[in-house]
Amino acid sequence: MHRLYPLVLLMLFVYGAAAGEQAMLARVTVYWHSPGSKERIAASGRLLRDGHCAVDPKKIPYGSKIVLPDDQLIAVDTGPAVVQRTAALRSARTPAQRKAIVIDRYFESRREAQSWAASHPNFMTVWVDSPEWAGVNLSEAD
């Protein structure tokens, strides 16, 4: 899979340039629903589900589409570790990685989250398509 990343990134670059998306270096972390907790409500008020993620809403507005090399997510949540970029600062090896945004990908289970994290690099280039940038009403974005 890792051999395909350069090709996928090139394809995303061509698509992103045409669609007006913005490329960003991101430290992608994972979180999951705790079996004992009742609520799965995100900071945006939406019910969390697979395909959602937490972002810094000052950098990536809620409702934005996040395109990873092998999937797409919707920004609906946030948290202090995401805003403070804790994971990027702790695991960075280069100046670019120290400046990376953090995207925290939501999974329904711990097993799914850990499996995905183990099979993907910590840092990756993502494409962000914001409803604000595309002129889409945020309340209509999913």
Regions found by a protein language model. Give the residues of each.
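Sec-dependent signal peptide recognition
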Residues: H2-L9
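Hydrophobic h-region of N-terminal signal peptides that target proteins for export
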Residues: L10-A19
